């Protein structure tokens, strides 16, 4: 009988001054890019943290720290694939991934299916759902200073 483990992840980044954001493993050329050591993909990073949390394998910082130049500029898709390898090495299987982008822009709806496919591909075909919300003008996402994402996962072993 399999044991089920749940994990939660969160990430937030402020916008920089250049266009070409990476969000949910897709490039959004007209959106401001998020600043960060990697590509600033808040959705991918939140999913990574949720998976690592569920497997009790630490978090992004402890596995892919900013002090290691190897991870500078790395894509969210590559981080997801690395995390997938870490959790499958411990005999975990992903049951479900659910992520939510928090911010005013870009609007995920028109590219939701494409984003789900990209995230799922990075996780070797895992079941993924993606939604988005705003904070009705409140906080740094509401004022347009950046983006955040929340993710929950279920994994089994």
Please place each PLM-identified region on the residue numbering:
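Short active-site-adjacent structural elements
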Residues: 109-110, 137-141
């Amino acid at each position: 009988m399999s044991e089920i483990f749940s994990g939660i992840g969160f990430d937030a980044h402020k916008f920089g001054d250049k266009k070409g954001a990476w969000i949910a493993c897709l490039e959004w050329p007209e959106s401001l890019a998020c600043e960060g050591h990697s590509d600033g993909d808040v959705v991918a990073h939140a999913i990574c943290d949720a998976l690592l949390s569920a497997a009790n394998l630490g978090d992004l910082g402890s596995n892919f720290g900013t002090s290691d130049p190897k991870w500078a500029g790395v894509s969210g898709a590559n981080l997801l694939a690395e995390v997938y390898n870490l959790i499958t090495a411990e005999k975990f299987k992903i049951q479900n991934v659910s992520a939510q982008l928090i911010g005013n822009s870009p609007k995920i709806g028109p590219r939701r299916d494409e984003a789900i496919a990209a995230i799922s591909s990075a996780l070797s075909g895992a079941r993924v759902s993606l939604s988005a919300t705003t904070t009705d003008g409140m906080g740094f996402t509401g004022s347009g200073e950046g983006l955040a994402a929340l993710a929950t996962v279920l994994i089994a072993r």
